[in-house]
Swiss-Prot record:
Species assigned in the record: Methanocaldococcus jannaschii (strain ATCC 43067 / DSM 2661 / JAL-1 / JCM 10045 / NBRC 100440) (Methanococcus jannaschii)
Entry protein name: Type II methyltransferase M.MjaV
Class of enzymatic activity (EC top level): transferase
Keywords: DNA-binding, Methyltransferase, Restriction system, S-adenosyl-L-methionine, Transferase
Molecular-function GO term, any one: site-specific DNA-methyltransferase (cytosine-N4-specific) activity
InterPro entries (UniProt xref): DNA_methylase_N4/N6 (IPR002941), MeTrfase_CN4_CS (IPR017985), RM_Methyltransferase (IPR001091), SAM-dependent_MTases_sf (IPR029063)
Designated gene of the protein: mjaVM
EC assignment: 2.1.1.113
Gene Ontology biological-process entries: DNA restriction-modification system; methylation
Disulfide bonds: none
Chemical reaction(s) catalysed: a 2'-deoxycytidine in DNA + S-adenosyl-L-methionine = an N(4)-methyl-2'-deoxycytidine in DNA + S-adenosyl-L-homocysteine + H(+)
Protein family per UniProt: Belongs to the N(4)/N(6)-methyltransferase family. N(4) subfamily.
PROSITE patterns: N4_MTASE (PS00093)
Amino acid sequence: MEINKIYCMDCLEGMKQLKDKTVDVVVTSPPYNIGIKYNKYSDNLSREDYLNWIEEVVKEIKRVLKDDGSFFINVGYTAKDPWIAFDVANVIRKHFKLQNTIHWVKSIAIQKEDVGNYPNIIGDIAVGHYKPINSDRFLSIMHEYIFHFTKNGNVKLDKLAIGVPYQDKSNIKRFNRKGDLRDRGNTWFIPYETIQSKEKERPHPATFPPKLPEMCIKLHGVKKTNLVLDPFMGIGSTAIACIRLGIDYIGFEIDEYYCRVAEERIKKELLKTDGKFDNVKNKNIITLDAFI
């Protein structure tokens, strides 16, 4: 199969056509099986059928992933079904080691008194987007999980590639650091971009922002990443992240409409470069191969 394409087909059939140990990083987000309304996919399988299906996908991912590769999987949950993310992780643990658990924070509120005495923070902070829960029992859900799996649990990461500056600059000298960056940790605040029309700008009901796969790839290490796979490409966020980083990608998406949206998003992303995107390895990028 050719790289830098999104194949509009079932990911199990697609991955079977990939060679063993050819992928450096997998970043994906499968259907959560929590009743989300997709165009073509039923998100209401029995728990047993859903987890069996997830395991078949995971087996193929393990086959195509290099021994020193990283597998990042984003899984959400609902207040009524809080265990689904852990059930998915428990299936994957049969085949991979859980190296890191990352919390994708979509919205956060911090009172000034809890921040400390920093001159650049002058008031309370409340930023991000979330879907409020109308309930007197459940809290609104502000985060999802990103499970980082590897084959052996010992893949070295480029933590400072997604590092953050020290608030207290005296820590740079105190900890004998070479620069003003520290480990971000496992809480990643990645808000959605503000949009005017969800139907036009974010038609997929459960997509992540391109910054999420971009950070996953950077954490694994851009220099050692040649090919990224997303088995559930959706509207192309992982492909966009790869284009921005100059890394080859391949993906699968069963829904024809989402494939076409992905194609348009990728075209717009390439136009933003104004012909100066010299780090794209394959300039002849074709996003769709065929509708099956």
